[in-house]
Amino acid sequence: MKTSKFDQLDRIFLPRSAAVIGASPRDGFANTLVGTKIRDRLFMVNPNYQEILGKKSYASILDVEDPIDYAVIAVPSQLVIGAVRECIEKGLKAVHVFASGFSETGLEEGIKLEKELAALAKGKIRLIGPNCMGIYCPKSGLSFNPAATNEEGSIGVISQSGTFAQMFNYFERSMNMKISKLVSYGNAVDLDCPDFLEYLADDPYTSVIALYIEGTRQGTRLHSALKYTAGKKPVAALKGGVTREGGRVASSHTGALAGTGETWSAMFRQSGAIQVEDIDDLMNTTVALSSSPPPGGKGVSSITYSGGFSAVQSDMCVKAGLEVPQFSKEAVGELRKIVPVAGTMMGNPLDAWQMFYRYSGNESRLADVFRIIAAEKHIHSIILQFDVIKFMVRMWGGQAGERLEVIARNFLEGCRYARDEAGKLVLITVYLDPYTDHEQERQLSFFLKKLCQSQGFPVYPTLNEAIRTVAYMYRYSVIRQDGGKGQVEG
């Protein structure tokens, strides 16, 4: 239910105007924001300049005649208190304090400064930070990263770490990860993780939430906010510092209480959030949640091009808590009519290398493979291992691109059927050798990845990442069924 608090945070993410205090013509917030849609409602504040990036620079925010909703305070920590005081006098709704040098230092001076900042802001202005990157919102133009796409999406991101927040921006294009709203909130002297969870839970533009957290001073409230949010939309959560050593680092990073790994795992499970293990898992799972339905069970089928991969995939799936059930006799019979028998393992995983390399003149039948597998009731997820670029280039030479597109488009027709008609989770792997100096291989790999992503399919660089993502998606389906009370096998 939307409240006045929702409206308050909505105004922060969607300000009518904004200012950068401590703006500079060099790299920084000013350079980023002048390239977004908020540029015409952006004010520069720095007494050392008369003009910054073609815009008038004011000595103080109090000198700006226009009303301002939001300001980025990009000055050294010792100047922050004065800047916030002027923002309060100006009547701003909220500020983001970028500077570090507060409680995260562990020094008495920084701790004292943070307490002074919290006391100053309380009841007078909403504050994000300090020690954080702030807000990225394509809809309003707020941003801290010039690499961001500014393309509106449905993924909400809450990160206590500024670097992890930026990673979501850096991988937006390559992972087809479209973001609605993102916040890096740092030391959280005022606005904290529960505030942003509750806001994104009610945000109509956000369908899935990625959360990175290191610690909190509001454990009970966080649990309540997580439960409320996860009850409305999926939340994938990564806790930094679940070991003793990691907890020590997490506490010193943002000054928050880290807690024990067991305590956090219990809270995530009871609230209905999906706990993941690393930043790759967080991004991979979030992308899958934003584009695909969770599987109805743990049965996985894989279409690959190698008997060796078939064996390894089966092991990996079982270790991840999944199952690799065999096809029914009826399905095997139907597959034999389509898949060349020679060199093929007619089982699950389906080692169908000849379909990738030698299928010619009847490629439309490739989609039927997915229709047959999708009809198997004990199969809930399908992984297409499309890591064949090197072999296709070697076999087809200059015609590899044309052959690849024909085969890929027919495979994708089957993938769409499995996802849209049969309700299966479909993931695709496209491997790109990071060290290759073969330009044709590189171009074809990027082409294939983009083609698959254009159809809304999550694409991963490794089989391990795809299988781990299926496992997390299955866990989410279990969480939805039992409200977070049960344990997930595996």
Where are the model-predicted features located?
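Catalytic-core regions of core metabolic enzymes
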Residues: M1-G490
